[in-house]
């Protein structure tokens, strides 16, 4: 009984310590946001990013964009904003920011990586086979555009493999559609679908 009581007290102390640390962390982040020292904010944002605290990093990147527009830090902020969304699996928004980065900083060191990541966003949004494959087609198009732009890219092999995976998905979906008509005994539709399938493949 005494042992159980001690164990319970230790758990309560641990929970209290965790809560205090969380409150302290929130308070510190609020102070950083209110700070007028942009360099401090920038370094804090990069620290948060390194710690995989993408939400807090994004909040700081957002308030710093106007302060560093046209400066080297502005380029970094634009790129890491996209990276935050990518790592948070918000792929639609990440793709938007990668493309915007490439447009605003066409000669930046991370443009190639950004455009590859943008294509990867479409790949990661590609749905399961039974659903509409618009994102799958878009991913193929994006990877192909990337390859045309950077034929010697270090990402070229990865792009080729991902295109092959996406194309195989479309082939499988088309074949399943043909088989569905056959199983439903809609034979004319099945024949037409199979003919179209064979021509395409």
Regions found by a protein language model. Name each.
Residues 2-11, 22-201:
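Acidic, polar-rich low-complexity tracts and alpha-helical solenoid repeat scaffolds
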